[in-house]
Amino acid sequence: MASQLPPYKQDFLKAAIAGVLKFGSFELKSKRISPYFFNAGDFYRADLLRAISLAYAHTVIEAREATGLDFDVVFGPAYKGIPLATSTTDKLAELDPARYGTTCYSFDRKEAKDHGEGGNIVGAPLKGQKVLIVDDVITAGTAKREAIAKIRKEGGEVVGIVVALDRMEKLPAADGDDSKPGPSALGEIKKEYGIPIFSILTLDDIIEGAKSFASAEDIKRTEEYRAKYKATD
């Protein structure tokens, strides 16, 4: 329930409602038509960016306290992950300067640069480093697999992923029959790579929080979507 969330998650949920959460009909990469869309690219206002970066930083700190999560570099996959990585690194240093005061960040280019410093990576070198990926959501998992492959190619070790939203959504069935139960992309990446994934909010949180401003029809459509596509993990 949104009312039971920690203050930083409540602030993030309010920011999401104010700036990035939209209801309507949105085609996803999976070709499903979602009744809601969460676009972290819309966190371009200073107050909204502060709310999301604080939420990421608090989530990271809680993950360290709960699981011992340890990392050297915060990595943001281009493009939406870039401001998330830089602002989260800054907020980590602000909240716990003794531990995170010298933490580095890095991000990738969509296309390798063949002049100047060259390469695919901007920011801290990844070789021999423990890397934490921060991004907005995991829907199909394709972008996260690409990011993991790039980090490994550079000699880094991915030790975890933090996302803003867990859609709690199962992967599309190989035979196109979405009536079958199935795992989420988030769960499959956890299993495939053996790394922990942490989320600030879940779809359940979004639905509960949206009841204060969304129409009854939007809430109903989102709840029906959740029931139809909810993952088994």
UniProtKB/Swiss-Prot annotation:
Transmembrane segments: none annotated. Pathway: Pyrimidine metabolism; UMP biosynthesis via de novo pathway; UMP from orotate: step 1/2. Its EC number is 2.4.2.10. It comes from the Eukaryota. Coiled coil: none annotated. Keywords: Glycosyltransferase, Pyrimidine biosynthesis, Transferase. GO terms for molecular function: orotate phosphoribosyltransferase activity. Orotate binds at residues 37-38, 139, 167. Catalyzes the transfer of a ribosyl phosphate group from 5-phosphoribose 1-diphosphate to orotate, leading to the formation of orotidine monophosphate (OMP). Homodimer. This is Orotate phosphoribosyltransferase. It comes from Colletotrichum graminicola. The lineage of its organism: Eukaryota, Fungi, Dikarya, Ascomycota, Pezizomycotina.
